[in-house]
Amino acid sequence: MGGDSVIQQPIRRSRQSAIRLFAQEYSDADLPEEGSGEYDPSFVITKLGAKVNRALVGGVIDRLERREHESGLTFTGHIRDPTGVHLFNVASFQPELHPDIEELLHRFEKGDRFLMLLVGRARWFETDDGGVFTSFRAEEFTVVDKDRYTHWLVDTAAATLRRLDAFEASMESDLTPAALEASGVPRDLVDGLILARGHYGEFDTENYRVGVLQGLSIALGSNAVIESAPAPEASGDQPTLSESVTEADDGGVAS
């Protein structure tokens, strides 16, 4: 399919770098930061201080479906990594991605389960009671083999450990840029850590370290890459999170 060529296209310099992170860190995040101007980037700030505008995520395709709306076709899917599930969508105003996602949908509906890498832009949906649910709008994606997925796991584990180390260093420091840098926090993580520490307070980082170990265990071949994990069916007439995020994309609630 054309997916391989899609993800290898050069990224425009104006784009934010794609951060590597596991699903648990992203799904735990509930701190959005909207850009002050029309063209300023928006971010989701994770507990470890990652400022996520764009991310490179990976895992097993767990769910994929097509929906028809007045504005056109949309697609939503789940990618499962060792720590949890990323929700992503392809919007109606992205027709250039529709042929490739249709091909993946055809494979998925035949029972095929495959490994994917996806570059997506951070999105969030805010509920009436103040809850925040995160997702990605797909920009580029491709099906990958186990070796390429293993490289992603190792790189993502290293990136997560770097944020964990920076977070631990920040706990012994004043929350000022100069003090954090003096404590060994990398400059690119300072702003995010100040925002994260001010919003989330103290929390146990052990789950994130376990997630890193789970990822490395799969990379080393100790655990299976693809395991069956059927997605729960939605009950009643309440919209699913996938539907809510799709409606937000069409209607404008998000980053």
Give names to the regions the model predicted.
Residues 1-51, 211-220, 238, 242-246, ...:
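OB/S1-fold single-stranded nucleic-acid-binding modules
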Residues 52-71:
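Structural detector for short beta-strands of small beta-barrel domains
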